Amino acid sequence: MRTRAVQRYSSHAGWLRSVACLTGLLLSLSAGAALKPGARAPDFTTQATLAGQPFTFSLADALKRGPVVLYFYPAAFTSGCTVEAHEFAEATDRFKALGATVIGVSHDPIDTLNRFSVSECRNKFAVASDADKHISKAYDANLFATPYASRTSYVIAPDGSILYEYTALSPDKHVANTLAAVEKWKAAQPRAN
């Protein structure tokens, strides 16, 4: 009897190790695929929502106003994505003071994002729907072999070039890193008289 339990435990532990290794491999494959600084940011127009109000978001139009912080996240209302949305909401005024627009993108339908933009984004910044995954594909931000976007953040300069890219499953450094990249960009701009 005890031998059978040990065999089941060993089999279960082996299966868990295999899943953990595969997950690590998949995450590392998705992490290396993102577009790099200096690359041209693919233009897109999509449905977005701010404070529960749907609108059409155009990257080209947003870049006319300044840099864009484009961040991809796996799914609305999941723990890491909620933490990341709260952190971006808290930092939105700092991004705006630097002339930057923040937009989050996931594969969620716009109805889900209407609620997410109110409760988790706290009416501070827009989130966009990439239900057909064409935007995340163009930015190499699909989490390999899953139906989700990877957690990838970009800072895009007004000229459409990628200034900064960061991919990590943890939401911890996305806001701080993109804010630092926007601050660095702003410091390099000629001062108006």
Region spans (language model):
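Cleaved targeting-peptide boundary
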Residues: 32-40
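Short active-site neighborhood of thiol/selenol oxidoreductases, capturing the structured segment around
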Residues: 59-86
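Bacterial N-terminal signal peptides that target proteins for export
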Residues: 2-20
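A short beta-strand-turn-helix
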Residues: 45-67
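Thiol-/selenol-based redox modules, centered on thioredoxin-like
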Residues: 149-193
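Structural microenvironment flanking redox-active thiols in thiol-disulfide oxidoreductases
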Residues: 82-121, 133-135
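Short loop/turn microsegments at loop-to-beta-strand junctions
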Residues: 42, 67, 150-152
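N-terminal signal peptide c-region/cleavage motif recognized by signal peptidases
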Residues: 28-30
